[in-house]
UniProtKB/Swiss-Prot annotation:
NCBIfam families (alphabetical): RutA (TIGR03612)
Organism lineage: Bacteria, Pseudomonadati, Pseudomonadota, Alphaproteobacteria, Hyphomicrobiales
Its EC number(s): 1.14.99.46
Protein name: Pyrimidine monooxygenase RutA
Keywords: Flavoprotein, FMN, Monooxygenase, NADP, Oxidoreductase
Pfam entry (one): Bac_luciferase
């Protein structure tokens, strides 16, 4: 099972809580996190893009770095780990993104890939005059399909003449092209998002569900399996989880309860308001899960709470779901959490024995 880290490009990571660690994003912090991930044998890191936050007492995600420039910097200081940036497709033309990706591919010597997002939070784009109108909610993946076609044509042939509804290329050129096959991630959970992923992407990222229910996401993976059966492409699912661990189950649970007790109600209310703005999509989108009040303190991602041994066992259960290629992890405290994962959790995981074995071989 592959394991990656969703690095904190925005302030405070993924906890909307006054009781959680409070910090600003910086290149130095993300460099330390990425180097630790590489040191512990993890497979990749991914950075999101967020152009406007949720406010509240914690100013949640009001402070953010930019994804491509961050990953370009990380590409220059790493040697093995794979790096994925996120493209806000309403802001950046596909030909420019194709060239930026090719540049970071060169910096990283073929270790770069791309996450495509359609944009769901109107204020992010309206503030720049780039929101195309609320009818876009229902046509996001039509737009993204043309976008991906341009990317694929430029990366694979160096040229695009696509004439679509949203993009019109006229002998558009790209050189140099990426040295490695450029992998695309999508995180769409709607039927349209799944169909897009099955047609154009290589990985589908989905939310884990619940607390200590590591296989509850299985129905989402089943839906992707059905979608990719229609296209015949090899696409695997990766699942997002937050890890809150400690020496004992009780200590980890106490931290989780403490974070929940400090939930930033104002920021959570803003999340709910933005989620409700999309009246075009169905009930199966990511934002519907994120805004659910059940566990909005960490945007309702799957949460693994327990001792190091408990978390290791829970993660080993994830890979038992057919079609699952790996997990994307976030931590309440990234630096300590990553070290604990690398030294106390990963060595106990059956699904990561190949990594611990490689580490022992290097020492020998």
């Amino acid at each position: 099972m592959n394991i990656g880290v969703f690095i904190p490009i925005g302030n405070n990571g993924w906890l909307l809580s006054e009781n959680a660690p409070q910090y600003m994003p910086s290149f130095e912090l993300n460099k330390q996190i990425t180097l630790k991930a590489e040191q512990h044998g993890l497979d990749f890191v991914l950075s999101m893009i967020k152009l406007r936050g949720f406010g509240g007492k914690t100013e949640f995600w009001d402070h953010n770095l930019e994804s491509f420039t961050l990953m370009a910097g990380l590409a220059a200081v790493t040697s093995r780990i794979k790096l994925y940036a996120t493209a806000p497709t309403l802001c950046l033309p596909p030909a420019i993104v194709a060239r930026m990706a090719s540049t970071i591919d060169s910096i990283s010597n073929g270790r770069f890939g791309l996450n495509l997002v359609t944009g769901w939070q109107r204020p992010e784009y309206a503030q720049m005059g780039l929101w195309p109108g609320d009818e876009y909610f229902g046509r996001r993946y039509e737009y993204l399909s043309e976008y991906a076609q341009v990317l694929r044509e430029l990366w694979e042939t160096g040229r695009s003449d696509l004439k679509g509804e949203f993009f019109q290329m006229e002998d558009c050129r790209l050189s140099p092209r990426p040295q490695a096959e450029m992998k695309i991630i999508c995180a769409g959970q709607s039927a349209a998002g799944m169909a897009f992923t099955a047609t154009y992407a290589d990985y589908n990222f989905c939310f884990g569900k619940g607390v200590n229910t590591p296989t509850a996401f299985a129905p989402t993976v089943e839906r992707l399996e059905e979608a990719k059966a229609k296209t015949g492409r090899d696409v695997s699912s990766y699942v997002l989880f937050m890890v809150i661990s400690d020496e004992t189950d009780e200590a980890a649970r106490a931290k989780w309860e403490h974070y929940k007790a400090g939930a930033d109600a104002e920021a959570i209310a803003w999340l709910g308001l933005q989620g409700a703005a999309d009246t075009k999509s169905g009930a199966d989108t990511n934002i519907r899960q994120m805004a659910d009040p059940t566990s909005a303190v960490n945007i309702n991602m799957g949460t693994l709470v327990g001792s190091h041994a408990t978390v290791a066992a829970l993660l080993d259960e994830v890979v038992t779901v057919p079609g699952t290629g790996g997990v994307l992890l976030v931590f309440d405290d990234f630096l300590k959490g990553l070290d604990d994962f690398g030294t106390k959790i990963q060595p106990l995981m059956r699904s990561r024995r190949h990594v611990t074995g490689e580490a022992l071989a290097e020492v020998a």
